[in-house]
């Protein structure tokens, strides 16, 4: 199974890249974590934010392989505990499809992305910097995998 993290933004600080790659490399081959970066639209004083959001959404949806289970990371989504995320990960594996998780840009996700999603996950009620979300999601997915596989990484 492949977990595909599709995120808006391409020039991340080194600590974000290193943090994401640390958890990415921990996954076994049968549970690969892949990052797809979507260039953020140019934002300025007179930017057409609705158009930028739409274009980012189109690029995100185009990056999703046909048949993938789509999960958005969005405030109105479901708040999962770590065991609930582990359960969701287990269900995704049993479903037999790869999973695409979508992280929007500063204004969030395009309506088309939200409509295409089968599930929505609220990572936190806090507003988190989008670069940090990549690392937190990678760690959370690895922790969920470790629970499902009785790996000692997660401790109760």
From Swiss-Prot:
Where found, per UniProt?
Answer: Cytoplasm
- Annotated signal peptide: none
UniProt catalytic activity = pseudouridine(1915) in 23S rRNA + S-adenosyl-L-methionine = N(3)-methylpseudouridine(1915) in 23S rRNA + S-adenosyl-L-homocysteine + H(+)
- Which cellular component, as a GO term, is one annotated location? cytoplasm
**Which positions are annotated as binding S-adenosyl-L-methionine?**
73, 104, 123-128
EC number(s) per entry: 2.1.1.177
The family database entries (InterPro entries) matched by this protein are listed as: Alpha/beta_knot_MTases (IPR029028), RlmH-like (IPR003742), tRNA_m1G_MTases_N (IPR029026)
Bilayer-crossing regions: none
Major enzyme class: transferase
Which Gene3D superfamilies does the entry mention? 3.40.1280.10
Q: Which Pfam families match?
A: SPOUT_MTase
Q: Which UniProt keywords apply?
A: Cytoplasm, Methyltransferase, rRNA processing, S-adenosyl-L-methionine, Transferase
Q: Name one GO molecular function term.
A: rRNA (pseudouridine-N3-)-methyltransferase activity
Assembly and partners are described as: Homodimer.
> What HAMAP family does the record point to?
23SrRNA_methyltr_H
* Physiological role: Specifically methylates the pseudouridine at position 1915 (m3Psi1915) in 23S rRNA.
The family database entries (PANTHER family) matched by this protein are listed as: METHYLTRANSFERASE, RIBOSOMAL RNA LARGE SUBUNIT METHYLTRANSFERASE H
Q: Which family does it belong to?
A: Belongs to the RNA methyltransferase RlmH family.
Provide the protein name: Ribosomal RNA large subunit methyltransferase H
The organism that produces this protein has a lineage beginning with: Bacteria, Pseudomonadati, Pseudomonadota, Gammaproteobacteria, Alteromonadales
């Amino acid at each position: 199974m492949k977990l595909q993290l599709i995120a808006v933004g391409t020039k991340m600080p080194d600590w974000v890249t290193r943090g994401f790659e640390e958890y990415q490399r921990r996954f076994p081959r049968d549970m690969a974590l892949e990052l797809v970066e979507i260039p953020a639209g140019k934002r300025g004083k007179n930017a057409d934010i609705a158009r930028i959001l739409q274009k980012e959404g189109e690029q995100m949806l185009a990056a999703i392989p046909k048949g993938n289970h789509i999960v958005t990371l969005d405030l109105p989504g479901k708040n999962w505990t770590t065991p609930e995320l582990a359960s969701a990960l287990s269900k995704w594996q049993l479903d037999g499809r790869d999973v695409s998780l979508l992280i929007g840009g500063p204004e969030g996700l395009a309506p088309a992305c939200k409509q295409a999603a089968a599930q929505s996950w609220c990572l936190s009620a806090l507003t988190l910097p989008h670069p940090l979300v990549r690392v937190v999601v990678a760690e959370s997915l690895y922790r969920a995998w470790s629970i499902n596989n009785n790996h000692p990484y997660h401790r109760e």
